[in-house]
Amino acid sequence: MEIVIQEVDRINRLVKKMMDLTRPALNDFKPTNIHQVLEEILILEKGTLEMKEGAFVQVYDPSIPTIKANKDELKQVFLNLVKNAVEASPKGGRVRISTQYNTDYIFRKKQDTLSPHNIVVKITDSGLGITNATMKKLFTPFFTTKKRGTGLGMAVSLKIVENHHGKIKVTSEENIGTVIQVFLPVNK
């Protein structure tokens, strides 16, 4: 029950932030344990996945340090991503959540600004995958493939991750599933 109350408070804070999108973001970054953030989200989504006779598989890297982040904003990102993975999963499907500590970003390009020290949160589902046409519009505000979707989840998630100086990478194969990786810098 305490987590539900915390989530209502968090949503209220996020709504207040979204009401004035023209104001520059005030980054309320504090030391944050990413595993704690993920566990709170999984508690919220566990029932939905269990109704589909599915389960979460968690593989956490114990060496991950705390990061400087806005915990409420990261909860919103991972709630969006985990909820999408749960919705995409077939009956009896598994949603895998893994974390890893990287000391070098192996996909680095010259124009890439990601810190060489980062954590990666990987969310993998076994759904139908994302079509190429949908992939091109994935982060476009108000684009949705859901009947009741607003089309804001992925756009807001990307904006939050970028405000944390991170990146989101999405790979998907039709009829196999989708992998979403969120890279967040570790401030050394």
Report the location of each language-model feature.
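Short beta-strand/loop element within the Bergerat-fold HATPase_c
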Residues: G92-Y105
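Short helix N-cap motif at coil->helix boundaries in the Bergerat
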Residues: I34, G129-K137
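Short conserved segments within the C-terminal catalytic ATPase subdomain
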Residues: T48-Q58, K91-G93
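A conserved beta-strand-to-alpha-helix junction within the catalytic ATP-binding
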Residues: K30-L42, S98-Y101
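Detector for a conserved hydrophobic position within an alpha-helical segment of the HATPase_c
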Residues: V161-E162
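Conserved catalytic submotifs in the C-terminal HATPase_c
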Residues: A55-P65, Q100-N102
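Conserved micro-motifs of the catalytic ATP-binding
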Residues: P24-N27, T66-A69, T145
